[in-house]
Swiss-Prot record:
PANTHER family from the UniProt entry: 54S RIBOSOMAL PROTEIN L1, MITOCHONDRIAL, LARGE RIBOSOMAL SUBUNIT PROTEIN UL1M
Coiled coil feature spans: none
UniProt keyword terms in alphabetical order: Repressor, Ribonucleoprotein, Ribosomal protein, RNA-binding, rRNA-binding, Translation regulation, tRNA-binding
Subunit structure: Part of the 50S ribosomal subunit.
Species assigned in the record: Kitasatospora aureofaciens
Any one Gene Ontology BP term: translation
Taxonomic superkingdom: Bacteria
GO CC terms, sorted: large ribosomal subunit
Recorded GO MF terms: rRNA binding; structural constituent of ribosome; tRNA binding
Protein name: Large ribosomal subunit protein uL1
């Protein structure tokens, strides 16, 4: 099939044994992008942690300087003035008891990408854990999604703030933009994500912390990154200029 040939041709351009510099990897990812639409660019990390142990859990948020290329849809659980503030800040869905009941039934789950709640409603929102938890959407004070300042939370999420959490296989996944982004913007987003992961390294984690990093586009081949190159990513030697 024509599609298969395209994918095979893209895959053949990637050296599976090589660890690519971030700027080189971004350029290769664009070159091997095999879709007709503006593909998402994602980075996956394998960490040297045991997420089954509470003191090795890696979880947090990062403000990508150039956003992800997609405006997140935000649901806010709030009442009164807080609800009005959330709506004014651009929240897509705002409500309290009735909305909580709706979500508990499994309704509207495809209508939002992030959830914010005021502390006074968390007693009720807490029962949504079985619905929101598996989707990584449960509000949490540590990530700034349980707050009285819902307007600020909505603005930050809409502006490119993303939440991350290591999965049971010790992997982390980040969307760092679109193929249409400039090379510099993609690398700067990657650097922001990487810096935050490094900052959150658990003291209990032993041995090599970042075991593997790979960059890819939608349906594109994985490109192994040299995770030792963590600083000055834009001024390091550029293979294209050699």
């Amino acid at each position: 099939m024509k599609r298969s040939k395209t994918l095979r041709a893209a895959d053949a351009k990637v050296d599976r044994e090589k660890l690519y510099a971030p700027l080189e990897a971004v350029r290769l990812a664009k070159e091997t992008s095999a879709t007709k639409f503006d593909s998402t660019v994602e980075v996956a990390f394998r960490l040297g942690v045991d997420p089954r142990k509470a003191d090795q859990m890696v979880r947090g948020t990062v403000n990508l300087p150039h956003g992800t290329g997609k405006t997140a849809r935000v649901l806010v659980f709030a009442t009164g003035d807080r609800a009005a503030a959330a709506e004014a800040a651009g929240a897509d869905i705002v409500g309290d008891d009735e909305l909580i009941n709706e979500i508990a039934k499994g309704n509207r789950l495809n209508e939002f990408d992030a959830v914010v709640a005021t502390p006074d409603l968390m007693g009720k929102v807490g029962r949504l854990g079985r619905v929101l938890g598996p989707r990584g959407l449960m509000p949490n004070p540590k990530t700034g999604t349980v707050t009285m300042d819902v307007a600020k939370a909505v603005t930050e999420i809409k502006g490119g703030k993303i939440e991350f959490r290591v999965d049971k296989h010790s992997n982390l996944h980040f969307i760092i933009g679109k193929v249409s982004f400039s090379d510099e913007k993609l690398v700067e987003n990657y650097a922001a994500a990487l810096d935050e992961i490094i900052r959150l390294k658990p003291s209990a984690a032993k041995g090599r912390y970042i075991k593997k990093a790979a960059l890819s586009t939608t349906m594109g081949p994985g490109i192994q990154l040299d995770s030792n190159r963590t600083r000055n990513l834009l001024v390091e030697e550029d293979p294209a200029a050699v």
